[in-house]
């Protein structure tokens, strides 16, 4: 008599590959791999991790609890994870020229929460870039912890240039007397003046914190000014341009080490995710290589090529423009305020072509955030796949043509398919199991 699958012993299930243990989840994982391989990922906050990072995150380190810090754990058996966390911290410090690093934050938002806890008190005034002008939820949005537990004030971009203007920040700082000024952004295409912002913070007696989650990879490659010499504390994610696992980390001057360590653990988190910290260590090593710098240069080149194509007459004639007239970073902000097309429609149109982006609000947006009047388009993931100028010109033309007149979607999709085929992602990995 054949035993029912339900009669399997726990050991059978323990040792079974995912295709046998949970075919439903395995099928979805395979479908997601296919989606990533066969489309073009251009969401500015997304990237592809190296295989070595996938291996680290899928390792036996996922089994280990390690509350505390290396040499000061609250659990036994931490000899190996202590080594890994120490390596990750030292690599982060070396990569960014920082005195201190904490690699335990589970995410960028957790890292940011720890910064608040370490530098300011509940009810203190903080001053950050407005969300609808390119800021982040954790920079003071009212429904976020940062806007609920702190008195959040905002500065916006210059209404004529759409650029962050230090003089506007200074005036807002003089008006609001913040305990902390926040630099960094999630949807802004230019470089901030960290030196000027630090001078403003000093003038009003505020701490200066920069969230470099989006541009950390560019900083690591030496292709973007570093906030580390100017900011009291710098937070970041390890993914986005840096191309590591989805997670966060914090850099700072040594004088803030004790407060930040306590804010991360036990202030915000319990046990760190050691398999993710191993992935961060690998990503930091990769980011220190010439290969990574070349990838970041191609990322910047691709963004400029895209911006130039989207400023062509056929796109302009559809009421579409590029915010600030170009880009200095890995993303382009497309302005649809004068177009009949809204952000949701633009996102859906490009999805039909096989290109994934996201709609985004733009400064002074007349439309609700659910549809928005902007598109945020990033070039990091394509550089990771190996795209160079020729390929960026092709994908830029696909996007420009689609937005200009909604040309034959099937023909545009065929061009996308060819690009994806020519630059395979994780070649040889056809199934998760």
UniProtKB/Swiss-Prot annotation:
It is found in: Cytoplasm. Its cofactor is pyridoxal 5'-phosphate. It is an enzyme of class 2 (transferase). (6S)-5,6,7,8-tetrahydrofolate binds at residues 131, 135-137. The keyword Transferase applies. Pfam families: SHMT (PF00464). The record marks 239 as: Plays an important role in substrate specificity. GO terms for molecular function: glycine hydroxymethyltransferase activity; pyridoxal phosphate binding. The keyword Repeat does not apply. GO terms for biological process: glycine biosynthetic process from serine; tetrahydrofolate interconversion. Pathway: One-carbon metabolism; tetrahydrofolate interconversion; Amino-acid biosynthesis; glycine biosynthesis; glycine from L-serine: step 1/1. Its EC number is 2.1.2.1. GO terms for cellular component: cytosol. It comes from the Bacteria. Its main location: cytoplasm. Catalyzes the reversible interconversion of serine and glycine with tetrahydrofolate (THF) serving as the one-carbon carrier. This reaction serves as the major source of one-carbon groups required for the biosynthesis of purines, thymidylate, methionine, and other important biomolecules. Also exhibits THF-independent aldolase activity toward beta-hydroxyamino acids, producing glycine and aldehydes, via a retro-aldol mechanism. Homodimer. Belongs to the SHMT family. This is Serine hydroxymethyltransferase. The lineage of its organism: Bacteria, Bacillati, Actinomycetota, Actinomycetes, Bifidobacteriales. The gene is glyA.
